[in-house]
Amino acid sequence: MVLTDPPYNVDVEETAGKIKNDNMPDDKFYQFLFAAFVNMEQNMEQDASIYVFHADTQGLNFRKAFKDAGFYLSGCCIWKKNALVLGRSPYQWQHEPCLFGWKLNGRHQWYSDRKQTTIWEYDRPKASKEHPTMKPIALMAYPIQNSSMSHCIILDPFLGSGSTLMACQQTGRICYGIELDEKFVDVIVRRYISEYGDAGVFVLRGDEKIPYAEVADDGTD
């Protein structure tokens, strides 16, 4: 299963800093998304589902890249927040959409009942100094539990603040996460260690597996 929260191309800047690849020309952003979606599609099982959070203002790019990369779009779910996010629009945003689908020639697995809806109501986190667009862990855990079983692999190629990782840990899944920005990698590691300790955290350097505590002690994290 894939659960991810790519850059929205809205040039977000908060106290936690800017997000890489978040301010591109329209055509470049489409190509960026298309390449990412192709890689995801090629690394998914035939019966795996995919969930992609995005911004409505970039909905056309997300949907076109999603379908062009070989995904079937089953629907669009809505994260309804408990509070608005102040911006420049006449209508203030209080939701984020999430594409849901699977491989065009594949099928999908469903592990919940028939009462689940497209509206997901979860409180948004208070402003974080660690990451400008942190998702609540409970929000990420919801689709994970609907579309995967325990011990399944969940791929998040844009791991960001690490909410998918934390949700996988809580629900007994295995998270394969990728994060380009080093400062957010540090955020992910600190967030995980603060909750679960550093006993299972290692740095791989070539064939060497080094306990994170040793790396942190020598100041090279």
Predicted features, each with a name:
Residues 1-185:
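Core catalytic lobe of class I
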Residues 189-221:
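S-adenosyl-L-methionine
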